[in-house]
């Protein structure tokens, strides 16, 4: 079953994106390089608690 997860910027810790992932097949935390409008640059966004 897919669940919604929030992605937060590592620099400013703001939650800028949300996506879904299958928690049964992907047990580790998701980390993607995305654009943060608060930092005004591309940073790593990691999965955070809701």
UniProtKB/Swiss-Prot annotation:
Q: Name one GO molecular function term.
A: structural constituent of ribosome
Does the UniProt entry include the keyword Ribonucleoprotein? yes
Is the keyword Ribosomal protein assigned to this protein? Answer: yes
User: Cross-referenced Gene3D superfamilies, in alphabetical order?
Assistant: Ribosomal protein L33
A GO biological process held by the record: translation
Query: PROSITE patterns, alphabetically?
Result: RIBOSOMAL_L33
Q: Which organism is it from?
A: Sulfurovum sp. (strain NBC37-1)
User: Keyword annotations for this protein?
Assistant: Ribonucleoprotein, Ribosomal protein
Q: What is this protein called?
A: Large ribosomal subunit protein bL33
- Protein family per UniProt: Belongs to the bacterial ribosomal protein bL33 family.
A single Gene Ontology CC annotation of this entry is: ribonucleoprotein complex
Name the Pfam families for this protein.
Ribosomal_L33 (PF00471)
Note the InterPro entries from the entry: Ribosomal_bL33 (IPR001705), Ribosomal_bL33_CS (IPR018264), Ribosomal_bL33_sf (IPR038584), Ribosomal_zn-bd (IPR011332)
């Amino acid at each position: 079953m897919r669940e919604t997860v929030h992605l937060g910027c590592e620099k400013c810790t703001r939650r800028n994106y949300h996506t879904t992932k299958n928690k049964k097949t992907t047990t580790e935390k998701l980390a993607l390089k995305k654009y943060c409008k608060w930092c005004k640059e591309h940073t790593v966004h990691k999965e955070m608690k809701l």
